[in-house]
């Protein structure tokens, strides 16, 4: 029973690990986790490349909770950079 509870808790928190470990401290973001770094290959706005989205050059909004593009006209609901999802 205890093992089942531990597994359930882990499964609940693993998808949110980046939100927990990538907190903003004193206005500066911590280094990104490997999970976040892995998103580069999917064209998500990434702070590792100077705050730019991969391919289209849109700027990251560091205040945004999910690191979405700050160009709100082009930012999708899923925080993909516009026009790059299938590049």
UniProtKB/Swiss-Prot annotation:
It comes from the Eukaryota. GO terms for molecular function: ion channel inhibitor activity; toxin activity. Pfam families: Conotoxin. Residues 20-42 form a propeptide. It is found in: Secreted. The keyword Ligase does not apply. Residues 1-19 form the signal peptide. Expressed by the venom duct. Keywords: Disulfide bond, Neurotoxin, Secreted, Signal, Toxin. Contains 4 disulfide bonds. One of its GO terms (cellular component) is extracellular region. The cysteine framework is XII (C-C-C-C-CC-C-C). Belongs to the conotoxin O1 superfamily. This is Conotoxin Cl12.3. The lineage of its organism: Eukaryota, Metazoa, Spiralia, Lophotrochozoa, Mollusca.
